[in-house]
A protein has these predicted regions:
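Amphipathic alpha-helical scaffolding segments comprising HEAT/armadillo-like alpha-solenoid repeats
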Residues: 1-9, 30-49, 75
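Alpha-helix N-cap/helix-start positions at coil->helix boundaries
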Residues: 15-16
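Structural detector for internal amphipathic alpha-helices that build alpha-solenoid repeat scaffolds
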Residues: 19-30, 54-71
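A short, structured loop/turn motif at beta-sheet edges
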Residues: 29-32, 123-125
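Alpha-helical linker/edge segments of TPR/alpha-solenoid repeat scaffolds
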Residues: 49-51, 71-82
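Short recognition patches in nucleic-acid-associated and regulatory proteins
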Residues: 76-114, 130-133, 140
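Short, compact, well-ordered microdomains
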Residues: 115-146
Length: 146
């Protein structure tokens, strides 16, 4: 993530650019870079309040707000894994690929159309249980402390 690019993308007021900026924050595994965006949060929130970022199954504005929470948490020294229980869009497989967590085990429950995971945060070592629910068009994830 390039903080200067993120600032430009939010300031563009283009919904797609703003969505890309939010996700570059959410996918960044460098807390020091994420922290540098803290002074821009009031401006970003004002822009997002005025722009409908769209979204098919959920508002992309919610993703932007989640990215702002990541920035605030990084600034306060709070581990990124603390956002998991506040959302239902982050896939544990992708979080593993990006280096945030390790999947300790997973189990597919075909009769429930669910996959269950136990994961460990790579930063603070907290253990979390994740339930993927795939009964609709888009899977969603329920994250809980183990």
């Amino acid at each position: 993530m390039d903080p200067e690019v993120v600032v430009k993308q939010f300031r563009s007021t283009d919904a797609h650019q703003m969505w890309m900026a939010a996700w570059s924050i959410l996918q960044c595994n460098d807390a020091d870079k994420v922290k540098t965006l803290k002074p821009y949060l009031p401006e970003f929130r004002k822009i997002c309040h005025e722009i409908n970022m769209g979204g098919a199954f959920r508002s992309n504005n919610e993703s932007a707000e989640l990215s702002f929470i990541c920035v605030e948490n990084a600034f306060r020294g709070i581990c990124r894994c603390k956002i998991y229980s506040q959302q239902n869009i982050l896939d544990p497989r992708r979080e593993t690929d990006q280096g945030f967590i390790t999947i300790l085990w997973s189990e597919l429950l075909k009769e429930k159309y669910e996959e269950h995971f136990r994961v460990q945060c790579k930063r603070c070592d907290d253990i979390l249980n994740v339930r993927e629910i795939a009964g609709g068009h888009v899977p969603w994830f329920v994250w809980r402390a183990a």
